[in-house]
Amino acid sequence: MKISASIYSNKEKDLETLVRELDAHGIDMFHIDCFDDSVFKDIARIRAISKTSIDLHIIHPHPESFFTLIDQYKVDFVSVQYNPEIKGDFFRPNGVTLWGLAITLKDSLAVVGSILQRADFALIMASEPGVSGKPFDKANFQRITDFKQQFPQKKVQVDGGVNDRIAFVLRLLGVNSIVSGNYLMKGEYLGVGMLNLHKTPSLQE
């Protein structure tokens, strides 16, 4: 199971220092919440020093407004937060980017099913989108099971309140990647947080 580090969860370190430290510990992806196009300046800074994949989460009523920048910076993964008000395209294949649909418990799989069929993966939001530090809603364990039954070929990423114990269960459920923000960034050592997210807890813990 891969780990995507939510870089904006760390306010103490400058971006370059944080990226180099995460890379030194073998992080799989850098997760960036996108509310406007200012994040692409940070993507450019990351691209200048790292080859690690960019994992962009668009939370905006007009995702198509970012398509040109996504193409320009060759963003590896893009998930678009579902919003029934979105009238244009959710995705634009470019031969590089893998596209996902981000959904919450409020979003019925029956309603978003036709969009999910066109996506490469789903980002299941287990807490409020774009808000760091919120707890994991355990109702999402069943949501993941339901999703995998309905869309067995789709990969699943989970974001929101993921700690080492939650990560253990998500791995058992077949989740492909997790986003870690507070848990990974707020610990004293990044390496310890990475190890804890990867390891299997003992029954005595």
Regions found by a protein language model. Name each.
Residues 1-77, 85, 106-119, 139, ...:
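Conserved N-terminal beta1-alpha1 strand-loop-helix module at the mouth
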Residues 1-4, 50-57, 91-104, 150-158:
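Short beta-strand/loop segments at the ligand-binding rim of alpha/beta enzyme cores
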Residues 98-106, 110, 120-126:
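Internal catalytic-core helix/loop-beta-alpha segment
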Residues 124, 128, 134-172:
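Active-site/ligand-binding-proximal alpha/beta "capping" segment
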Residues 82-86, 123-132, 173-194:
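Glycine-rich phosphate-binding active-site loops on the catalytic face of alpha/beta enzymes
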